[in-house]
Amino acid sequence: MIAPACRPFVRAALLPVAFASVLAAPALAAPDMNKVVREVFPAAETGFDPAAVHDLYSGTLIQGIFETLYTYDYLARPSKVVPLAADGMPQITDNGRTWTVKLKKGIRFADDPVFGGKPRELTADDYVYSIKRLIDPRIRSPWAFLVEGKLVGLDEVAEQAKKSGRFDYDRKVPGIEAVDRHTIRFRLKETDYNLPYILAHEPTSAVAREVIEKYGESDGRALANPVGTGPYRLAKWVRSSKISLEANPHYRGFTWNFASADPADAALVREMKGKAMPQVGRVEISIIEEDQARLLAFQGDEIDLMNMEGPLAPKVLDGGTLKPELQAKGVKLSRIVDPDLSYTYWNMTDPVVGGLAKEKVALRRAMAMSYNVADEIRVIRNGQAIEARYPIPPGVVGHDPAWKSGIAYDPAGANALLDRFGYKRGADGWRTLPDGKPLVVRLSSRPDTLGRQQDELWKKSLDAIGVRMDVHKDKFPELIKAEKQCKLQMRVASWIADYPDGDNFMQLLYGPNTNQSNNACARIPEFDRLYARTQKMPPGPERDKLYQEMTRVIEAYAPWRLMISRYRNMLVQPHVLGYKRHPILHAHWQYLDVAPRGPNK
């Protein structure tokens, strides 16, 4: 079980010093531009603005281009927070309400014309500016919840911006200030046990104000022209098709010096230990939506790293191991249960499926009861998932492995529930609303194999209870945009842990997070009240008890149908060295090397 690196952070002070130096050593050599890692994404990116994007694939790119104050040790399990741009772990005073962070000196942004040909050093002001952007009303950041209500004086600046139409970035905020060029001080309203995770999460990455002001759109977002301090910079971008990254020549680098307690990592450590990083000079990412096309590209040695989705499992795996023919070629498999959750949500503001009225609750519960998760795991995922019965997945602090869900597959019970609340069947077999109007629900999904399979299973499920379903297809970025505006009625969504704590999942239904991470646009007073109480608690039995109460509220009102947590099966070509799937980090290129390949490669 992945326990948080900083669960006792405030009370037990700092993490072991050994971890503080893992990423601090200077590089000994420049990356080799002839070393290329080719990867594939199954869905398109939405952009490169840390404050604006909200999808896994864009977030992965941001991790490679920008830098947060903290990150995670590459091999440590459970996940451990370590410094990245910070020069050591924070100094914590005032009973955990004041955090002081020192920056490493001499970190440079990648070159850009906006800097006028001069070197641009990373400073404390950059982090102050970047974190303020999360709460700027004009940007409408989906990550505002990370800082709302937490930093002294910051909410007041946001409220003033709502009235004036302009966020005053120059106004001093006691909760986040640059003490000097390389020192940041955070003052919290209450002790926040998740602050270390937030400062390791890519929305808090440093951007340069002059870059945002030069390239930003009218809404304050700068989805193109990323300029960061990370190991890579954007070299070429063909939207929704190809992304090319190249090594940032000003990146300071580090020495690969990670340790692992897992004997299975011994060979990996031997082949990588002591190398100047990054070794990889270029990263080429292709967007290939169809499962079979991705597999063919991997088999044809056109890509080096690929996450194998469930539909491909029979072609690649025997149980949980690679088929012998792939093993014979030297292909490697890195496999974990992702700290993620797939669920179907219903828009709680929608006039057909939303609301807290008893008949609306009955409709959602009946639809949830009609869906057989076992069929999804068997048919769609080919066994590459486990059923999710609790809203916090395995490997995340707060997960309850013994939980007995109150929502089970029960089509007979679902039909009885609809009958009881006035959803009558017409002569054609389809149900109507209690007022006699037609009942039609609309599922939104991606136009790929997985999306079509999910459409079919949901239609089969709803057909069995007499609920007519239409399907709306759109590209992934457009679906994300629409759901943030509460415009979708029903969709299958996934959330992978930003940090390994249950709060990261329970916040998905917190009312004030609507238009950010609350895709169901739910405002359930009982849930919100309980969630607010958890914000003042450290991880432990008392908070876990509240999470259990919150889970019963979710089951009672059914804004979601919990579905699965997925296995992540990363296929790795034999010439790629150093890869191990991390439960939280998604950008891994700076930790890899590429061995010489045969003459036909």
Where are the language model's segments positioned?
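Surface-exposed intrinsically disordered loops and tails
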Residues: 36, 115, 153-170
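Bacterial N-terminal signal peptides that target proteins for export
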Residues: 2-15
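Bacterial N-terminal signal peptides
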Residues: 12-24
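N-terminal lobe/hinge region of extracytoplasmic solute-binding protein
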Residues: 40-94, 227
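Sec/Tat signal peptide C-region and signal peptidase I cleavage site
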Residues: 25-29
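Extracytoplasmic/periplasmic ligand-capture domains
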Residues: 30, 74-75, 90, 98-100, ...
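Glycine-rich and polybasic anion-binding loops at the starts of cofactor/ligand-binding domains
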Residues: 563
